[in-house]
Amino acid sequence: MYNAEKKQPTYWQRLKIAFQYVMPQLYLTLAAGWLAKQKWGSVTHFIIKLFAKKYHVNMQEAEKTEFKDYASFNEFFIRPLKSEARKIDENPTALCLPADGRISQCGHIEQQTLLQAKGHSFSLVDLLAGDTELAKEFEHGEFATIYLSPRDYHRVHMPCDATLRKMIYVPGDLFSVNPFLNEHIPNLLARNERVICVFDTEFGTMVQILVGATITASMSTVWAGIINPPRSTEVKEWTYSDESAVQLRKGQEMGAFQLGSTVINLFQADKVELANHLDVGVPVRVGEVLAYKK
């Protein structure tokens, strides 16, 4: 049931929601992934130009500013930025934002429940693929969810220095992810395919989650490469011992979306305080302050 404070969706909006349940999510995603890899010369350059114009992509931030410099749409979509395009906050007590986009939700984790949108919440256990022990670590903690729109830079960075403890691939649905659907599809973020990364940091245990969506062709990390495809029907888990530890620095790239979606960060109770300016809909960029050490 929808929250009484929310407007009921219109007829066309209800059709849009219903379509999410019946469309061939996987086949659309596979097709989009195949198309995005093709190198069709001037045709590819023309498509990239149309996309950049439609979504107002700022090409002046990119290392390669000309459309002709991108051999495929994938290459364009995960384009690196100029080194000076994003400044990483140098305050040692601050954690920085991992992605460009807008705040979808942020705040306090009520016991083991996170807010997805007004009227919709989801559980930590569901989000973390049934890992009850991991979920307990974040009871009464803090969280931040960042939505990456098509125009945004789609590489994901580290909020702080960290050591990778565990990575979990979770198969799932491929619903489209955007603010409207977050309000109308229950448990969307805990149902979609995702990659969960668990880190040890001086700010306590931190989780950073890459959430997939329709036409998210792949998600990758700098230590493991492309995680999907191939897509598995089972949860996969990798643990990292001291011998195989992956050390990452604040602001360092940790992963990327090829056509992207959402990044979720989880923090333990009484470890950090989210920055005051963060609120639903606020635009954010890599390197800006996410939270401060308590």
UniProtKB/Swiss-Prot annotation:
<keyword id="KW-0210">Decarboxylase</keyword>
<comment type="pathway">
    <text>Phospholipid metabolism; phosphatidylethanolamine biosynthesis; phosphatidylethanolamine from CDP-diacylglycerol: step 2/2.</text>
</comment>
<dbReference type="GO" id="GO:0006646">
    <property type="term" value="P:phosphatidylethanolamine biosynthetic process"/>
</dbReference>
<dbReference type="GO" id="GO:0004609">
    <property type="term" value="F:phosphatidylserine decarboxylase activity"/>
</dbReference>
<keyword id="KW-1208">Phospholipid metabolism</keyword>
<dbReference type="InterPro" id="IPR033177">
    <property type="entry name" value="PSD-B"/>
</dbReference>
<dbReference type="GO" id="GO:0005886">
    <property type="term" value="C:plasma membrane"/>
</dbReference>
<comment type="similarity">
    <text>Belongs to the phosphatidylserine decarboxylase family. PSD-B subfamily. Prokaryotic type I sub-subfamily.</text>
</comment>
<keyword id="KW-0865">Zymogen</keyword>
<keyword id="KW-0456">Lyase</keyword>
<keyword id="KW-1003">Cell membrane</keyword>
<feature type="site" description="Cleavage (non-hydrolytic); by autocatalysis">
    <location>
        <begin position="260"/>
        <end position="261"/>
    </location>
</feature>
<feature type="active site" description="Charge relay system; for autoendoproteolytic cleavage activity">
    <location>
        <position position="157"/>
    </location>
</feature>
<comment type="function">
    <text>Catalyzes the formation of phosphatidylethanolamine (PtdEtn) from phosphatidylserine (PtdSer).</text>
</comment>
<keyword id="KW-0670">Pyruvate</keyword>
<keyword id="KW-0444">Lipid biosynthesis</keyword>
<protein>
    <recommendedName>
        <fullName>Phosphatidylserine decarboxylase proenzyme</fullName>
        <ecNumber>4.1.1.65</ecNumber>
    </recommendedName>
</protein>
<dbReference type="InterPro" id="IPR003817">
    <property type="entry name" value="PS_Dcarbxylase"/>
</dbReference>
<keyword id="KW-0443">Lipid metabolism</keyword>
<feature type="active site" description="Charge relay system; for autoendoproteolytic cleavage activity">
    <location>
        <position position="261"/>
    </location>
</feature>
<dbReference type="Pfam" id="PF02666">
    <property type="entry name" value="PS_Dcarbxylase"/>
</dbReference>
<dbReference type="InterPro" id="IPR033178">
    <property type="entry name" value="PSD_type1_pro"/>
</dbReference>
<feature type="modified residue" description="Pyruvic acid (Ser); by autocatalysis">
    <location>
        <position position="261"/>
    </location>
</feature>
<feature type="active site" description="Charge relay system; for autoendoproteolytic cleavage activity">
    <location>
        <position position="100"/>
    </location>
</feature>
<feature type="active site" description="Schiff-base intermediate with substrate; via pyruvic acid; for decarboxylase activity">
    <location>
        <position position="261"/>
    </location>
</feature>
<keyword id="KW-0472">Membrane</keyword>
<comment type="subunit">
    <text>Heterodimer of a large membrane-associated beta subunit and a small pyruvoyl-containing alpha subunit.</text>
</comment>
<keyword id="KW-0594">Phospholipid biosynthesis</keyword>
